Amino acid sequence: MLKQPSAPHKPIIIGSIFILTLVFLMTFFGGNLFQFFGLIKISSTSMYLSRLLFWLSLCLIALYAVKIEHQKLLLWEEKEYPITFQIVALVLLFLTVFAGVILIQIGFTLAGSNNKSATLAKIVLLLKKDFILLLFTAITAGVVEELIFRGYLQPRLQIIFKNPHVSIFITCALFGMMHYKYGTLINVIGPFFIGLVLAYFYWRYKNIKIAMLFHFLWDFILLIISTNSTHQ
């Protein structure tokens, strides 16, 4: 029988450390791994493979949770809400994240910081030519990233540290660091802020589906706008 632990035990600690290590390695050495196997660092093939690696990681984490921890992937019981609540929640999430991202953009612009990512520009050009890859990228971000960072890691770190705010900060810092590969500070701070919003939402309302749907829609809309405003 699967049940939620009230105190940290060894498998949960090991699993959390494994995820922290995995995110670190993927952030700083993921591109080099593709180059080691003779693949171009930024190409359709490497993009598809990297997304598939995310899904594989999620499957392994879920397997670890069930077989080793003897817990569900999601420790927090999913709460259900009426459709009106879900719509209002999505709208408020969009408004909150949009306002925050705009303020971050303004702050970096006033500070004279470089907000342009050459890596991201190359990715956008690839996605402009391949809508399936664009859709797959957005779905992967919405589903896999939320299930790993918010669904798996956040509740377990809360058990370990016995403090929701510490667990939220750590998962959001990791979420931001994962975007370090784009090469600019704003590409770390922006996701960190978005992670904060989604982490506190999940902590408060215990509904991962709304967080996943928002994350997917946010990335999908931004990618559509970016590809349509980019000239080859």
Can you say where each PLM-predicted feature lies in the sequence?
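Alpha-helical transmembrane segments in multi-pass membrane proteins
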Residues: I12-E69
